[in-house]
Amino acid sequence: MLTKFHSYETGKAFTECCDCGCNLHDVDIYIINQSFAGNECIFECAMCLQCRERMNEQLSENSRVAMFDFMHDHADMKSRQERLSNNSETEAYIESCITCDKLRSEAKTFTLGAMFSGDQLIKGPFPLIICDDCEAKIAASISDETRKFWDDYIAEHFPGPPSEIDLPNKTKPILI
């Protein structure tokens, strides 16, 4: 079930940052990303916020601006906050794409993002999903430099699929 945000590989809660290896319960905030093709998890990672911010600094300025602009232009956060409260069921946050409202069940692939403090899900902008169509638009907007950085990062930290295969939308999973 998606709302548990556990590792599909181990069936257990994530415990380590995929980048620095720190214990996720020793940091203030961490993010979980899971990419799915249908109901199958094809990529997953948990990353402390410090590593996520450091990674963001490695992306080209043009890519950071393009991704920010895409989210700003397409995600209606005010409407989302009005519709969902911190007391809303987690499923309500992830039933449709944050940027186009395409139902998760209609997406061929999608990426799920969630933010945690300890074992507590932080609700607000997260949790969220981005559908295959919006992932493709984001992927088309990033620079070759950023694409190479992300492809190299996946290949280095996650040997085997998805670093060595073409996914249905011909892009690597995105990091939310």
Give short role names for the model-derived ranges.
Residues M1-E9, E57-E91, A140-I176:
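Short, intrinsically disordered terminal segments enriched in charged and Pro/Gly residues
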Residues L2-F5, V27, C45-M47:
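N-terminal alpha-helical interaction blocks
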Residues G11-I42, N62, A92-G124:
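Short recognition patches in nucleic-acid-associated and regulatory proteins
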Residues D28-I31, C41-E44, M71-A75, Q120-G124, ...:
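Short amphipathic alpha-helical patches
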Residues I42-F68, K123-W150:
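Short metal-binding segments enriched for Cys and/or His
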Residues R83-T90, S96, K102-G124, I130-D133, ...:
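Cys/His-clustered metal-coordination modules, chiefly Zn-binding fingers
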